[in-house]
Amino acid sequence: MSALAVEPEPARGDGWDELVRIWEETDAPEGCKVEIIEGIVTVAPPPANQHNSIAAKVHRVLIREIPEEWNVYQTLGLALPDRAGMYMPDLVVAPEAVVDEEPGNFVPAAVAELVVEITSKWNANHDRIVKLQAYATAAVPLYLLVDRWHSGRPTATLYGEPQNGLYRVLDAVEFGRDLHLPAPFDLTIDTSTFPLG
């Protein structure tokens, strides 16, 4: 992964606006993901085929079960100015009307009902630590971390009930077992279909 270093500034005011401007104007190769992580604009290469396959499988389950007024987004930017972050999660479930009404290329992270991140080998700690804390701080109700690189044992962990910037683990399974998402989703994801490696 390559990163374009940007001098960290306060998360609010001109510093945040400048970071967003750089993020919006970064001309990355097609398929690459541009994010702001802890005040640094980063460019990550396209995800691996297995990563995309997992995203497609989770997307398929979610789209069948979510309320009609919600949608599943694959390239929706989530703004977290208090954490100097602009993330592009693998999947976001959010109310369609809110996304449709928000101008620009991103929405406040707090509008998300569920965020799904699938780790890549070279930046897994962003998803495990930085984004976990940021989504909890933004009070995103559910965060599903699909960690293909977890200590040699791929896992899926569902975090929820955010309070004071911290999540509680609601469920954690190794690939091969079912993971249940509580209401308002009330659905099960079969991780045995997730490719390994």
Regions found by a protein language model. Give the residues of each.
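Gly/Pro/Ser/Thr-rich low-complexity, intrinsically disordered segments predominantly at protein N-termini
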Residues: 1-138, 142-197
